[in-house]
Amino acid sequence: IPGKKYFIDINKLVKPFSTKSVANSYNALDVKFCELKVPDGFKVNIFANNLQNPRNIKVSENGDVFVAESRTGRIKILRDTNSDGVSDLHKVFAKGFNKPFGIEINSEYLFIADVDYLWKIPYRLGQLRADSKPIKLTKSKALGESNGHWTRNIVLLNNKIYISVGSRGNIGIEDNPRATIQEFDIKTNEQKIFATGLRNPIGIDVHPITKKIFTVVNERDGMGDRLVPDYFTQVEKGDFFGWPFFYLGNNTQPHIDVPHKYKNSVVKKPDVLFKSHSGPIDLIFYNKKQFPDELYG
């Protein structure tokens, strides 16, 4: 509900199964009936339409908007050539991917993560079409199988790409790299586990000042309408957030045997909780100067 404030105390969670589980389906509405509610002084308009399953975007330094059309396997560029707030140039930059999602850019390459690989394509600022074929950076299955949570989001920091990989299922023991954030060195092509126990860390970003990694996580279902809260949190190398054996600290997941090596694990508590089953799907740190002063800090 826009404007409503929620406070969820991690030390006062309800007990598992103490609230009923609720299943809600979505209703697809015509865009003219779906005006976003925004604070006074803000305005939202349609920047682009008639896209096919757009799932993620990345804005380049010159304002070009890269869009992952996941179902079609394409990366598009949207450009506003007359600065009226509406894109008037749409081009397919590259295609042939398997459900592309994550997009990142540096001074030399456009990086793309799909369910099969992390890719790179030579890129010059302002370029509208790829001049060469995408280059595979990871090995086969290095980002897991395509079943379950299929989005592979990425963020670039100091020549390393951090890749969020969700679990295959709701609760279960799964092999790496499922339910992790992976760290990939673009200079050496070395891949390591960065953090674990994250059921679906679908959104990921770098704080512009501290240069720390943050993520939003979609938590598990099946324990009632008020468990388990989704969350936003900073992530450090080696962190374990509990899934599937624990949640929100050392709260034990019912009906699953905890292997001996996890019984004394230090489970990191997340920083900010969202209402259970909210399903946050991304985050971005705003570092521009258009917003009122009270919205900074």
Residue ranges: model-predicted function:
Residues R74-I77, Y109, Y117-W119, T180-Q182, ...:
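A short loop-to-beta-strand structural motif that recurs across blades of beta-propeller domains
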Residues N50-N62, K95-Y109, A113, L143-K160, ...:
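Beta-rich, blade/repeat-based domains predominating
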Residues K76-E108:
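Blade-loop segments of beta-propeller domains
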Residues L78-S83, I121-R129, V235-G242:
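Short loop/turn segments immediately following beta-strands, especially the blade-tip
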Residues P2-P39, T151, S167-N170, A179, ...:
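Beta-propeller domain segments
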Residues F66-A68, I112, Y162-V165, K212-V217:
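Residue position within the beta-strands of beta-propeller blades
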Residues T72, S87, V115, D131, ...:
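A detector of repeated loop/turn-to-beta-strand junctions in beta-rich toroidal repeat architectures
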Residues L89-H90, K99, E104-N106, D116-L157, ...:
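Asp-box/WD-like beta-propeller blade repeats and closely related beta-sheet repeat scaffolds
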